[in-house]
Amino acid sequence: MNNSKDNPFRGAIARKARIYLREGLDCVYFLNKAGQAEPCPACTSLVFQGKTCEEHIHNNNLLSWQVVRQLERQTPQRQSSN
């Protein structure tokens, strides 16, 4: 199921992500290097198998739904210049 030599926390991250999805998130989110919530549709489908995608194997910065909502409120929305 899980290759623990990749990241021993990968299964735990997947379990936590499943909880966050049940609590209202539509996608799994990780904190990116710019400090923004980054959705990962690949992880969203893989967490139900106890895995994360290859890009996020070593990323333990899983965001809860509360943090995602807070970051969305803090990030100013871009307005088009049309």
From Swiss-Prot:
Q: Which residues cross the membrane?
A: none
A GO biological process of this protein is: symbiont-mediated suppression of host gene expression
UniProt keyword annotations, A-Z: Eukaryotic host gene expression shutoff by virus, Host gene expression shutoff by virus, Host-virus interaction, Inhibition of host innate immune response by virus, Interferon antiviral system evasion, Viral immunoevasion
Entries under Pfam families matching the protein: Acc5b_avian_CoV (PF05528)
Q: What role does this protein play?
A: Involved in host translation shutoff without degradating host RNA. By suppressing host gene expression, facilitates the evasion from host type I interferon immune response.
The molecule here is called Host translation inhibitor 5b
What is the native source organism of this protein?
A: Avian infectious bronchitis virus (strain KB8523)
